[in-house]
């Protein structure tokens, strides 16, 4: 369009354009009538009620940084307990990994009456007052004097003795750290025993060989948690320390099959290699030479996890190999072990283990748990706060409950004898290829 055409356009339509502008301004700036205001407000209220909207309008002063709500402050902090074991570094504990419903706070607290004591009698299970050193402030006395049985709050038995007759309101505690496949007790009636003191977690007096804690925030670790140079120096496959050669689980059969795909050095009475018990060099070579440690149990029973896993498997820089995932997973750190039932065949497992040996980055991922968790090994010879949440201290705690907490194993056979797999069930189910 030329300049002349534009000039003619405005000359012809200028009055109409001026009128349109005036009309527009009147519409925009003219005041709303009272009836219109009422209609508008009613519509707003109706909308608010229909949708239940209640949105506060923040003034400028409410937006100042120091007045903004802190979401971290609103999240309740979990209570932690400080563990200060003898001769070791103290650490804060947020929770213990267990299948039991008894929380850590309950485990760590006893309602003690000043000036009074509670009595624990070992009828034929051994032990001594030293086993209560994890909770000396709970005022429990340990005795092996059978004449004091009528006064005992709890009585430990390792096998039946007809001379012992339980009293009402008295806990009968069965002590055993052996697999149900290799141990047992003949009892006069199915509900004779109140609780067990041993590897089982589903009992108030559970006393495993070790346990895992989730660390409190102050005790968690940052940065590198494993020595990369140590891992890079490893060259061998797996080590196995074993003296029980024929077992219910048939673990020896699986190891023989796996040896076709992975180097497994067998130490002890069941293999050609020797390493004396208690020799520190044995632990050192697990750190420096081997990638994996065989922790297969002699039988597959509920909660049955022994010192093989807790000591050599987790106190060294090595990945433990276990038989069945569901038996150990509730009690150990996440992504910290390898189970044979994770694989479709023996060969598939061997291939994966060889892959980890050749991929140190993937191998080291199995130690990431050390940032947030700690594994405690209970060797049975040192008694301190590490034992407080378990075993004898928990029998002591139960003895202080008022009214006396009712605990009962209603069917002993179902609880003990019927919790093991038939011999070789798992091993026989895994094909070679």
Swiss-Prot record:
Cytoplasmic-side segments: 1-12
Tissue specificity remark: Expressed in the pharyngeal-intestinal (PI) and anal valves. Expressed in ASG neurons and in one or two neurons in the retrovesicular ganglion and two neurons posterior to the PI valve and PHA and PHB neurons in the tail.
Cofactor annotation remark: Can also use Co(2+) or Ca(2+) in vitro.
Pathway the protein takes part in: Protein modification; protein glycosylation
Keywords: Glycoprotein, Glycosyltransferase, Golgi apparatus, Magnesium, Manganese, Membrane, Metal-binding, Signal-anchor, Transferase, Transmembrane, Transmembrane helix
Membrane disposition: Single-pass type II membrane protein
Bilayer-spanning residue ranges: 13-32
Required cofactor(s): Mg(2+); Mn(2+)
May be important for donor substrate binding, annotated site positions: 243, 267
Glycosylation sites: 194, 359
GO biological process, alphabetically ordered: carbohydrate biosynthetic process; fucosylation; protein glycosylation
Thermal dependence, as annotated: Optimum temperature is 23 degrees Celsius. No detectable activity at 37 degrees Celsius.
Changes after translation: N-glycosylated. Glycosylation is important for enzymatic activity.
GO cellular component: Golgi cisterna membrane; Golgi membrane
Protein localization: Golgi apparatus, Golgi stack membrane
Gene Ontology molecular function: 3-galactosyl-N-acetylglucosaminide 4-alpha-L-fucosyltransferase activity; alpha-(1->3)-fucosyltransferase activity; fucosyltransferase activity; glycoprotein 3-alpha-L-fucosyltransferase activity; metal ion binding
EC number: 2.4.1.214
The reaction(s) this protein catalyses: N(4)-{beta-D-GlcNAc-(1->2)-alpha-D-Man-(1->3)-[beta-D-GlcNAc-(1->2)-alpha-D-Man-(1->6)]-beta-D-Man-(1->4)-beta-D-GlcNAc-(1->4)-beta-D-GlcNAc}-L-asparaginyl-[protein] + GDP-beta-L-fucose = N(4)-{beta-D-GlcNAc-(1->2)-alpha-D-Man-(1->3)-[beta-D-GlcNAc-(1->2)-alpha-D-Man-(1->6)]-beta-D-Man-(1->4)-beta-D-GlcNAc-(1->4)-[alpha-L-Fuc(1->3)]-beta-D-GlcNAc}-L-asparaginyl-[protein] + GDP + H(+)
Lumenal topological segments: 33-433
Protein activity control: Inhibited by Cu(2+) or Zn(2+) and to a lesser extent Ni(2+) ions.
Purpose: Preferentially catalyzes the addition of fucose in alpha 1-3 linkage to the first GlcNAc residue (with or without alpha 1,6-linked fucose), next to the peptide chains in N-glycans. Unlike in mammals, does not require the prior action of N-acetylglucosaminyltransferase I to generate complex N-glycans.
Record's comment describing the protein's domains: The C-terminus (424-433) is important for catalytic activity or for enzyme stability. The N-terminus (1-78) appears to be dispensable for enzymatic activity.
Similarity-based family: Belongs to the glycosyltransferase 10 family.
Name by which UniProt lists this protein: Alpha-(1,3)-fucosyltransferase fut-1
Protein source organism: Caenorhabditis elegans
């Amino acid at each position: 369009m030329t300049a002349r055409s534009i000039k003619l356009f405005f000359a012809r339509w200028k009055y109409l354009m001026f009128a349109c502008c005036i009309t527009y301004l009147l519409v925009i700036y003219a005041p709303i009538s009272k009836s219109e205001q009422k209609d508008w407000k009613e519509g707003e209220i109706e909308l608010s009620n229909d949708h239940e909207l209640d949105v506060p309008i923040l003034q400028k002063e409410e937006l100042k940084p120091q007045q903004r709500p802190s979401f971290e402050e609103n999240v309740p902090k979990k209570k932690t307990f400080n563990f200060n074991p003898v001769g070791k570094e103290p650490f804060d504990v947020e929770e213990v990994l267990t299948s039991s419903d008894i929380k850590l706070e309950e485990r760590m607290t006893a309602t003690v009456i000043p000036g009074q004591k509670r009595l624990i009698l070992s009828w034929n299970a051994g032990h001594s007052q030293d086993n209560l050193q994890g909770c000396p402030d709970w005022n429990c006395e340990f005795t092996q004097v059978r004449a004091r049985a009528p006064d005992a709050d709890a009585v430990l038995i390792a096998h039946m003795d007809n001379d012992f007759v339980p009293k009402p309101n008295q806990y009968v505690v069965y002590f055993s750290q052996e697999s149900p496949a290799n141990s047992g007790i003949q009892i006069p009636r199915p509900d004779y025993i109140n609780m067990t003191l041993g590897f089982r977690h589903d009992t108030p007096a559970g006393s495993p060989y070790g346990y895992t804690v989730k660390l409190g925030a102050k005790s968690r670790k940052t940065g590198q948690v494993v020595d990369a140079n140590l891992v890079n120096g490893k060259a061998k496959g797996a080590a196995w320390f074993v003296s029980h050669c024929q077992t219910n689980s048939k673990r020896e059969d699986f190891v023989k099959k796996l040896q076709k795909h992975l180097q497994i050095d067998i130490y002890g009475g069941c293999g050609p290699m020797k390493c004396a018990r208690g020799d520190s060099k044995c632990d050192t070579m697990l750190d420096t030479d081997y990638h994996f440690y065989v922790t297969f149990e002699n039988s597959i029973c509920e909660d049955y996890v022994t010192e093989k896993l807790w000591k050599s498997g987790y106190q060294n820089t090595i990945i433990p190999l276990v038989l069945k995932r569901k038996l150990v997973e509730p009690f150990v750190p996440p992504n910290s072990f390898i189970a044979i039932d994770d694989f479709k065949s023996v060969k598939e497992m061997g291939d994966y283990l060889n892959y980890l040996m050749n991929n140190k980055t993937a191998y080291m991922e199995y130690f990431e748990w050390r940032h947030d968790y700690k594994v405690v090994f209970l060797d049975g010879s040192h008694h301190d706060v590490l034992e407080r949440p378990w075993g004898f201290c928990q029998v002591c705690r139960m003895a202080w409950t008022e009214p006396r907490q009712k605990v009962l194993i209603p069917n002993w056979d179902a609880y003990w004898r019927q919790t093991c797999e038939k011999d070789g069930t798992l091993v026989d189910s895994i094909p070679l290829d």
